[in-house]
Amino acid sequence: MYVHLALILGCWTVVLQGAETDVGERADNRRPIWNLAHMVNAVKQIPTFLDLGANALEADVTFKGSVPTYTYHGTPCDFGRDCIRWEYFNVFLKTLREYTTPGNAKYRDGFILFVLDLKTGSLSNDQVRPAGENVAKELLQNYWNNGNNGGRAYVVLSLPDIGHYEFVRGFKEVLKKEGHEDLLEKVGYDFSGPYLPSLPTLDATHEAYKKAGVDGHIWLSDGLTNFSPLGDMARLKEAIKSRDSANGFINKIYYWSVDKYSTTRTALDVGVDGIMTNYPNVLIDVLNEDGYKDNYRLATYDDNPWETYKK
């Protein structure tokens, strides 16, 4: 009888310990932050920026006609960076797959998302939709490995013009036709411009998403090059207010290019979900500072990048 009682008490101890662990994990109300390494366009740069603490990377995709051909930015670019690093797009995607596929020798558990900055400004109107179709085909074949143990990271498609919503429609249609509509759960969207003559209003951006057939998985970016003055962050604050409103359509907001400690702290204080930076180690340092480590943490794969975390 005593042995039986001891076994029962022992089992309850294990259960309670497990419950305490679960509660502790759920009780972590710190804002998860995506640490986006800026302008990672050569495969040799991938481990370098991951080693600096990035949990996400951004690459620039340039086109020949409607075909995504290179990861390349070109001049001018952020101060202190090599603007002409590049790789063939298919090779870059295959390499990303290696770093984000469990079991691969290069796998990095902390690498959870990448942003494709799609340079569609060079495209004619009739090339926009085919470009979206071609990017979907490249991702399906070279990153997702046609659905057979491909990379697990989330993908954000960043378009520089709200008028290019047909890109998204073409992208989605390819995955549906190929029988991989499920992969759209891994895809988010960011309409970031155009910048000239002025940035579109949030209402205009929302309308573009409706035309693209997108409801959810929405990221919004705001910022300037790292050599520009900080300014008052008026648009950023407006976007965060919209995100946190009852009828907000934005899920995540990131700010670029944030390289200074002071600007990093300011962006976090305002309420961003992500910071795009040339120095991921700066954000890591700030996240470990008093006043920040209790309110923010580096996002992990278990954090849903399409979930809205209000301020």
From Swiss-Prot:
<dbReference type="GO" id="GO:0008081">
    <property type="term" value="F:phosphoric diester hydrolase activity"/>
</dbReference>
<feature type="active site" description="Nucleophile">
    <location>
        <position position="73"/>
    </location>
</feature>
<feature type="binding site">
    <location>
        <position position="117"/>
    </location>
    <ligand>
        <name>Mg(2+)</name>
    </ligand>
</feature>
<dbReference type="GO" id="GO:0016829">
    <property type="term" value="F:lyase activity"/>
</dbReference>
<keyword id="KW-0732">Signal</keyword>
<dbReference type="InterPro" id="IPR017946">
    <property type="entry name" value="PLC-like_Pdiesterase_TIM-brl"/>
</dbReference>
<keyword id="KW-0964">Secreted</keyword>
<dbReference type="GO" id="GO:0005576">
    <property type="term" value="C:extracellular region"/>
</dbReference>
<keyword id="KW-0479">Metal-binding</keyword>
<feature type="propeptide">
    <location>
        <begin position="22"/>
        <end position="26"/>
    </location>
</feature>
<keyword id="KW-1015">Disulfide bond</keyword>
<comment type="function">
    <text>Dermonecrotic toxins cleave the phosphodiester linkage between the phosphate and headgroup of certain phospholipids (sphingolipid and lysolipid substrates), forming an alcohol (often choline) and a cyclic phosphate. This toxin acts on sphingomyelin (SM). It may also act on ceramide phosphoethanolamine (CPE), lysophosphatidylcholine (LPC) and lysophosphatidylethanolamine (LPE), but not on lysophosphatidylserine (LPS), and lysophosphatidylglycerol (LPG). It acts by transphosphatidylation, releasing exclusively cyclic phosphate products as second products. Shows complement-dependent hemolysis.</text>
</comment>
<keyword id="KW-1061">Dermonecrotic toxin</keyword>
<dbReference type="GO" id="GO:0090729">
    <property type="term" value="F:toxin activity"/>
</dbReference>
<keyword id="KW-0354">Hemolysis</keyword>
<keyword id="KW-0460">Magnesium</keyword>
<dbReference type="GO" id="GO:0046872">
    <property type="term" value="F:metal ion binding"/>
</dbReference>
<keyword id="KW-0865">Zymogen</keyword>
<feature type="disulfide bond">
    <location>
        <begin position="77"/>
        <end position="83"/>
    </location>
</feature>
<keyword id="KW-0204">Cytolysis</keyword>
<feature type="signal peptide">
    <location>
        <begin position="1"/>
        <end position="21"/>
    </location>
</feature>
<dbReference type="GO" id="GO:0016042">
    <property type="term" value="P:lipid catabolic process"/>
</dbReference>
<feature type="active site">
    <location>
        <position position="38"/>
    </location>
</feature>
<feature type="binding site">
    <location>
        <position position="60"/>
    </location>
    <ligand>
        <name>Mg(2+)</name>
    </ligand>
</feature>
<protein>
    <recommendedName>
        <fullName>Dermonecrotic toxin</fullName>
        <ecNumber>4.6.1.-</ecNumber>
    </recommendedName>
</protein>
<keyword id="KW-0456">Lyase</keyword>
<keyword id="KW-0800">Toxin</keyword>
<keyword id="KW-0442">Lipid degradation</keyword>
<feature type="binding site">
    <location>
        <position position="58"/>
    </location>
    <ligand>
        <name>Mg(2+)</name>
    </ligand>
</feature>
<comment type="similarity">
    <text>Belongs to the arthropod phospholipase D family. Class I subfamily.</text>
</comment>
<dbReference type="GO" id="GO:0031640">
    <property type="term" value="P:killing of cells of another organism"/>
</dbReference>
<keyword id="KW-0443">Lipid metabolism</keyword>
